[in-house]
A protein has these predicted regions:
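Flexible, glycine/charged-enriched surface loops at secondary-structure junctions
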Residues: 75-89, 276
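Short, small-residue-biased leader/transition segments that mark boundaries at the very start
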Residues: 1-7
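Short, polar loop motifs at secondary-structure junctions
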Residues: 42-47
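Glycine/threonine-rich flexible loop motifs
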Residues: 22-31, 287-288
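Active-site diphosphate/adenylate-binding microenvironment
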Residues: 89-165, 298
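A short helix->loop->beta-strand "cap" motif at the edges of active sites that frequently abuts
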Residues: 34-37
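Thiamine diphosphate
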Residues: 9, 48-59, 63-69, 135-301
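An anion/phosphate-binding loop that grips the pyrophosphate of nucleotide cofactors and donors
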Residues: 12
């Protein structure tokens, strides 16, 4: 939250948007402090004043323009601002490190990611699909391979629910490597029946469901806007995806405690089948991405 406050509620007097579109993620520009001067750099002249008028507009290739502006930065002392950003980033990083090392139940999603990484190592290929689940995955997984960590919902064209087909493609392209899919329980519902395809065509990925029994990002956004007593259509309840996968001929296992995670993963890989490890995680946890998502959808700012 401190990281969000510094970056998006700062007292910055000038903001340089280099090739950045003022779309819904930035509340069409409304998330920028009204007092700030805005410099926009874009190769497309139509973007310069889109959604928010620029105080200074520079039309051109971002790389070329910035290479001309960079020498000017050395003329001013930015050390104070840099330290502010470093402190905010360090605060968030410290929190993530503590949660990865926390073995208590209910399982924190970052702890789940740490356990998966402990098991599969840097030779595996990782895909993260969902809302908060994508954040937890891409910040926690590490792979030595190019494109070894993929978040399906990244950017404007990221598509919820594509984790399963992404994982299938990764396993077909690199059958010798472990392919681990971290799936939210909401995103699991989009293409879960493709486990039938995986069984028939022998595509043994391991899908780990980060199951908080909800559309987590939506639920926590509703808590921010409506309160915990007025949740609408965001609670999913416990669904036994592991049993569905077993019914299709794959391997399934339910996990409810930290010490069960790695043994379950070992059994999943040893089965040689497409596998689903359904892990019940802490339903109260959200990621720093959720407040940003909530702010981006607010129309009163």
């Amino acid at each position: 939250l401190e990281f969000r406050r510094v970056l998006f509620r700062s007292q910055a007097d000038v903001i340089v948007a280099a090739g950045l579109r003022f779309n819904w993620i930035l509340q069409s520009g409304a998330i920028i402090p009204p007092s700030a001067k805005v410099v926009r750099i874009d190769i497309d002249p139509h973007e310069i004043d889109r959604n928010r008028m620029a105080d200074v507009g520079l039309v051109g290739d971002v790389g070329s323009v910035l290479s001309q502006l960079t020498p000017l930065l050395n003329q001013r002392d930015h050390s104070g601002w840099i330290e502010t950003l470093r402190a905010a980033s360090s605060s968030l990083l410290d929190y993530e490190i503590r949660m990865r090392a926390n073995p208590s139940d209910p399982i924190h999603p970052l702890r789940l990611v740490a356990r998966i990484q402990e098991f599969a190592g840097e030779d595996a290929l990782y895909i993260a699909d969902g809302g908060d689940t994508v954040y937890f995955g891409i910040t926690g997984f590490s792979s030595r391979h190019r494109a070894g960590v993929i978040g399906t919902a990244s950017g404007l064209l990221g598509c919820l629910g594509t984790g399963i087909p992404f994982a299938m493609a990764a396993k077909l392209a690199r059958p010798e490597r472990k392919v681990i899919l971290l799936n939210g329980d909401g995103s699991m519902g989009f293409n879960a029946m493709e486990f039938d395809t995986m069984v028939r065509h022998n595509i043994p990925i391991v899908c780990v469901v980060n199951n908080d029994c909800a559309w987590g990002m939506i639920k926590h956004s509703q808590e921010l806007s409506l309160g915990k007593e007025r949740l609408q259509c965001s609670e999913l309840g416990l669904r036994h995806y592991e049993k569905m996968v077993e019914g299709l001929g794959g391997y399934g296992e339910l996990v409810t405690s930290d010490d069960e995670i790695v043994p379950a993963l070992e059994r999943a890989v040893a089965s040689g089948k497409p596998a689903c490890i359904n892990v019940i995680t802490d339903p109260t946890v959200t990621s720093p991405a959720t407040p940003l998502f909530y702010q981006s959808l607010r129309m009163d700012q």
